[in-house]
Amino acid sequence: MSRKPCCVGEGLKKGAWTTEEDKKLISYIHDHGEGGWRDIPQKAGLKRCGKSCRLRWTNYLKPEIKRGEFSSEEEQIIIMLHASRGNKWSVIARHLPRRTDNEIKNYWNTHLKKRLMEQGIDPVTHKPLASSSNPTVDENLNSPNASSSDKQYSRSSSMPFLSRPPPSSCNMVSKVSELSSNDGTPIQGSSLSCKKRFKKSSSTSRLLNKVAAKATSIKDILSASMEGSLSATTISHASFFNGFTEQIRNEEDSSNTSLTNTLAEFDPFSPSSLYPEHEINATSDLNMDQDYDFSQFFEKFGGDNHNEENSMNDLLMSDVSQEVSSTSVDDQDNMVGNFEGWSNYLLDHTNFMYDTDSDSLEKHFI
């Protein structure tokens, strides 16, 4: 069912109200009160619509209406409420006593809206005009005539900075490819440091092997010369192998795998790595001077037997580093050349006691 119209349109007056029409409306409402707007035009003798009479009374003729200019406080309230409520003027009018919604709407359109635009603020969104230009761009892009390149540009520009993919990923890949070796395998920094440490340990182990092999060979020669069983042939490699393998077995528990591999690569039994050729020839040459007086050698250390025993132990069991640093090749040749004379001296002096590390030799010489 449709709503019945308040009045018939025939013969009704439209346009501005005259002063006579205002007096008739004021006197009727003053006598009968508000309400019944459909019957008021006929009862008051007005050729107006009932709606027109209501709006004229509410917005202009009502005595409680506040007239005059809006204050600065009222302007701020209107701007704040319009930013949150929009064009709902009746809601805004509730927060401004004695002000009508029509008056607030007219004041907004004639004064406040223009003032905000002069300040660079969008009167619709209440934001700066520069940032409010994006919606127009989006509307143009949503049209069917927009190209794909424009849409892609708008997406990249509207994307937040943190959500964009980092451009440094390609640089990281290029750095990894630069670090790769010629055959295509990547180089790792940890493997390089391990190789450096392995080289240092291998060089140190080789030096220790050489010194240890020389020390064991000198001890074997001294013990054999004291027994008088040293042959005229060159010392075989088997004697070096026995002494060297025992030393390696004792050190296997405390050494790591890299040191064992390094010892396996190095051949400690080759004549070139242990002794030069002139040293081996010197050890095999046993035509020593028989007239050497060894009693003079021990007399310079003292007259008592205790000092003689300590001096011999110091000579025979000296540290390996001392032999390498202080004993030259010529000194070793002289010492080896006098081994047979020492054995004769030991046989003549029955009070001398000698202790050796080898299990195959006797503990004391009498």
Swiss-Prot record:
DNA-binding region of this protein: 37-61, 89-112
Biased composition (Polar residues): 130-146
Localization terms from the record: Nucleus
Induction summary: Slightly induced by glucose, gibberellic acid (GA), jasmonic acid (JA) and salicylic acid (SA). Transiently induced in inflorescence by mechanical stimuli such as touch or wounding, including herbivory-wounding. Up-regulated by sulfur-deficient stress.
Gene3D superfamilies reported in the protein's UniProt record: Homeodomain-like
CC annotations in GO: nucleus
Chain intervals with Low complexity compositional bias: 147-158
Tissue localization of expression: Expressed in generative organs, mature leaves and trichomes.
Phenotype upon loss of function: Low levels of aliphatic glucosinolates and decreased repressing effect of brassinosteroid on glucosinolates.
GO MF entry, a single one: transcription cis-regulatory region binding
One of the protein's GO biological processes: defense response to fungus
Residue span(s) of domain HTH myb-type: 9-61, 62-116
Principal location listed in the UniProt entry: nucleus
CDD domains cross-referenced by the UniProt entry: SANT
Disordered: annotated span: 124-170
Keywords on record: DNA-binding, Nucleus, Repeat, Transcription, Transcription regulation
InterPro entries per the UniProt record, alphabetical: Homeodomain-like_sf (IPR009057), Myb_dom (IPR017930), Myb_TF_plants (IPR015495), SANT/Myb (IPR001005)
Subunit structure comment from the entry: Can form complexes with MYC2, MYC3 or MYC4.
Role: Major regulator of short-chained aliphatic glucosinolates (GLSs) biosynthesis. Together with MYB29/HAG3 and MYB76/HAG2, promotes aliphatic glucosinolate biosynthesis but represses indolic glucosinolate biosynthesis. Prevents insect performance (e.g. lepidopteran insect Mamestra brassicae and Spodoptera exigua) by promoting glucosinolates.
PANTHER family: F14D16.11-RELATED
Entry protein name: Transcription factor MYB28
Native source species: Arabidopsis thaliana
Gene symbol of the encoding locus: MYB28
